[in-house]
UniProtKB/Swiss-Prot annotation:
<feature type="transmembrane region" description="Helical">
    <location>
        <begin position="21"/>
        <end position="43"/>
    </location>
</feature>
<keyword id="KW-1030">Host cell inner membrane</keyword>
<dbReference type="Pfam" id="PF11125">
    <property type="entry name" value="Phage_MS2_lysis"/>
</dbReference>
<comment type="similarity">
    <text>Belongs to the Leviviricetes lysis protein family.</text>
</comment>
<keyword id="KW-0204">Cytolysis</keyword>
<keyword id="KW-0812">Transmembrane</keyword>
<dbReference type="GO" id="GO:0031640">
    <property type="term" value="P:killing of cells of another organism"/>
</dbReference>
<keyword id="KW-0578">Host cell lysis by virus</keyword>
<keyword id="KW-0472">Membrane</keyword>
<keyword id="KW-1043">Host membrane</keyword>
<comment type="function">
    <text>Induces the formation of specific membrane adhesion sites between the inner and outer membranes, apparently leading to host cell lysis. Lysis may be performed via activation of host murein hydrolases.</text>
</comment>
<protein>
    <recommendedName>
        <fullName>Lysis protein</fullName>
    </recommendedName>
</protein>
<keyword id="KW-1032">Host cell membrane</keyword>
<keyword id="KW-1188">Viral release from host cell</keyword>
<dbReference type="InterPro" id="IPR022599">
    <property type="entry name" value="Phage_MS2_lysis"/>
</dbReference>
<dbReference type="GO" id="GO:0020002">
    <property type="term" value="C:host cell plasma membrane"/>
</dbReference>
<dbReference type="GO" id="GO:0016020">
    <property type="term" value="C:membrane"/>
</dbReference>
Amino acid sequence: MGLKAKHKENLCSDSERSKRLYVWIALAIVLSDFTSIFSHWIWGLLILYLQTLMDLPTFVMNV
């Protein structure tokens, strides 16, 4: 009897583990989507920043 109960416990923990794994995979997918969106924003901001840096000497010369 005790052995059967233990086996059931193991099955339960396995299903919980797989559920946790699916949650982590879903989180990873969502986070990767967010990071790709943010990376687009970051690249855009970097390009704008670089453009302003390139325009900075002319701006300083004008002042």
